[in-house]
């Protein structure tokens, strides 16, 4: 490749997911690829301040931000702290108006606070018990791709999605 400046793409996985979800995606050589990982949220930290901390990991001018699901919400929040070339969201929403009925129900009722997220570490054992050895390949995929299992992080993430305030969004989001 000649001396052209490459555009950097930052990839943000969805809630509980590891950057390994992107491992089979190939990008043309004119792009520099950086995989973002979830960092532990501070106690009572808003998504606004979390995004500010995450934005400190971005060291390139006008990158492209790509986020999946909750990662799509986060890259939109990061873009409020960093000038970006483009935001691409996958299986995500652009504003709270687009949140699913179940998320809106959770916001109104607070039912999301009752989820037994401490069982997440036992998910493989539960699935193997219920479905038997035939589910082993799927369980191994869960271990590989859904590696963020800290119950406090998961509670924080769900709460941030349910209570996300964004109504107006960048019209250039893909």
Identify the role of each PLM range.
Residues 2-61, 109-120:
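Active-site catalytic motif of lipid deacylating hydrolases and related acyltransferases
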Residues 11-12, 66, 90:
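Short hydrophobic segments within beta-strands
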Residues 153-174:
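Conserved serine/cysteine hydrolase catalytic core
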Residues 24, 77-78:
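Active-site signature of alpha/beta-hydrolase-fold catalytic machinery across serine-
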Residues 2-4, 26-28, 81-82, 166-171:
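Short, conserved loop/helix-junction motifs that constitute active-site signature segments
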Residues 83-116, 162:
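Flexible "cap/lid" loop of the alpha/beta hydrolase fold
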Residues 66-75:
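Gly/Ala-rich beta-loop-alpha elbow adjacent to hydrolase catalytic centers
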Residues 122-135, 145, 161:
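Helix-loop "lid/cap" segments that line or gate small-molecule binding pockets
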């Amino acid at each position: 490749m000649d001396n052209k400046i490459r555009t950097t793409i930052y990839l943000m996985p969805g809630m509980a997911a590891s950057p390994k979800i992107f491992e089979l995606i190939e990008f043309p050589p004119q792009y520099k690829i950086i995989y973002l990982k979830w960092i532990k949220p501070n106690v009572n930290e808003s998504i606004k301040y979390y995004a500010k901390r995450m934005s400190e990991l971005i060291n390139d001018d006008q990158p492209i931000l790509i986020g999946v699901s909750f990662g799509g919400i986060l890259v939109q929040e990061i873009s409020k702290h960093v000038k970006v070339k483009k935001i691409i969201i996958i299986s995500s929403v652009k504003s709270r108006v687009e949140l699913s009925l179940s998320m809106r129900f959770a916001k109104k009722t607070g039912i999301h606070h009752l989820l037994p997220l401490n069982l997440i570490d036992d998910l493989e054992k539960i699935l193997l018990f219920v479905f038997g050895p035939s589910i082993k390949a799927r369980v191994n995929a869960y271990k590989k791709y859904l590696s963020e299992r800290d119950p406090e992080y998961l509670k924080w993430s769900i709460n941030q999605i349910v209570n996300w305030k964004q109504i107006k969004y960048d019209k250039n989001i893909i």
